[in-house]
């Protein structure tokens, strides 16, 4: 937290996890789409979408090639913190920005009351359209964040005490390809349109070998994506784990 009592065990795993703002924004958008009910959006959702969009624009920047990038964030994987261009964060931020534009279009008077003008919504749209998504062409996979696939491999045969956060210092976890919970895999579930079926399959295979089961939040997403790419036995195992 910025105000009040701190509740995160370690600030890079808490304060830098800006993606939570986009997660909440998505909840408003999905409720509207599924229910067809615009009333909650008008009452409070619009303000959430506008203020989170403003936050994303303050965090991101266009580089010299015109790509919109976000630095210094932590994605869902808390074993990889304060990184550049976490794909889950970037895609969710872009979706948040587009949702804010749509909400302001649906409720123009309420948007004006919040100080939103055409110039601001155009900036949101430009950022979303230019969002940078890293890709490792040599390996044929998406790095969870910029440079992730070049980090040292984690020795899973030697480090067998789980959860790792209770047995290993972060100074060992952060520079390695070891993942607490679904991150890039979660991006493929929540922002499925951004990946081809072939990319999904290669990404699932790559990240499955590097993901611990240190978070109960992960199994349901891994079940969905394993089923999506045809790993049905593994999907069943994860679904069973998620139900426990």
Predicted stretch roles:
Residues 1-13, 67-86, 142-156, 170-171, ...:
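Carbohydrate-binding/catalytic loop surfaces
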Residues 41-50, 68-73, 114-115, 237-241:
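Beta-strand segments within the central parallel beta-sheet cores of soluble alpha/beta enzyme folds
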Residues 23, 37, 77-78, 85, ...:
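Acidic side chains
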Residues 1-59, 89-90, 97-100, 104:
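Aromatic-rich carbohydrate-recognition surfaces in CAZymes
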Residues 4-8, 55-119:
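Acidic/histidine-rich catalytic neighborhood
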Residues 19, 41-42, 69-71, 80, ...:
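Generic, ordered loop/turn and secondary-structure boundary motif
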Residues 17, 26, 30-33, 43, ...:
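Active-site core of glycosidic bond-cleaving carbohydrate-active enzymes
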